[in-house]
Regions:
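Short, well-ordered alpha-helices that flank and scaffold nucleotide-derived cofactor binding pockets
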Residues: 21, 25, 80, 84, ...
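Short beta-strand/loop segment that forms part of the nucleotide-sugar
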Residues: 32-43, 63-65
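Hydrophobic targeting segments
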Residues: 2-8, 16, 23, 34-39
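Acceptor/aglycone-binding surface of glycosyltransferases and processive sugar-polymer synthases
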Residues: 66-67, 71-81, 90-93, 99-173
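A conserved acidic beta->alpha catalytic loop
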Residues: 40-49, 98-99
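Residue-level recognition of the N-termini of beta-strands and the immediately preceding loop/turn
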Residues: 3, 32-36, 60, 89-94
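Short helix-capping segments at alpha-helix termini
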Residues: 27-32, 54-59
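Short, well-formed alpha-helical segments that are part of the catalytic scaffolds
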Residues: 12-27, 46
Length: 173
């Protein structure tokens, strides 16, 4: 099964290559072929070129945005790119700043068989935002529960099937 990990980056190349190194050291079974797509959001700092070979990562590609467009646009661009140009079964967008734990990839991969092509959502357990952000976020969750009756735990850290990516691209979700 081919897995594409999408990592947006703006200037923080050191963190991205640290994350890739951590992904490389995960105990991933041979059932999965891991590739990384870095989406460079028009960084104005020089990229740290790592010529290191990663034995558990099949390939690393860098897509360069022409201008800085932000994290969400980078993920959307990466998803569109892999849908149109790459062979894959699932995509995992990740933050390159260390907020998403690479160990959770193992949990995603375990859940793929039972996911029925539905998105698998990771929940951040460690947040580094300030107190005001956390209070507002809790208020947002309370309002959501009040109006929908459901607790929605969602972030960018997801595992998306190719079918889900296709729907997102075709329907411009």
């Amino acid at each position: 099964m081919k897995i594409k990990i999408l990592i947006p980056v703006y200037n923080d190349w050191q963190s991205v290559f640290k994350l890739i190194d951590e992904i490389n050291h995960l105990s991933i079974t041979s059932d999965f072929q891991i590739s990384v797509i870095i989406i460079n959001d028009a960084s104005n700092h020089d990229r740290i070129d790592k010529q290191k070979e990663f034995e558990n990562i099949q390939s690393i590609k860098i897509l360069n945005m022409k201008k800085n467009q932000g994290h969400s646009r980078c993920i959307a661009t990466g998803l569109k790119y892999i849908f149109e140009k790459e062979e894959f079964d699932h995509a995992i967008p990740m933050d390159g700043d260390g907020e998403d734990r690479p160990e959770e990839i193992i949990e995603f991969l375990k859940q793929i068989k039972n996911s029925n092509n539905q998105p698998i959502v990771g929940e951040r357990v460690k947040r580094s935002e300030n107190l005001i952000f956390r209070i507002c976020y809790q208020l947002h969750k309370l309002i959501t529960i009040t109006f929908t009756g459901k607790s929605i735990k969602y972030g960018n850290f997801t595992c998306l099937s190719k079918d889900t990516v296709r729907k997102m691209i075709k329907e411009k979700a």
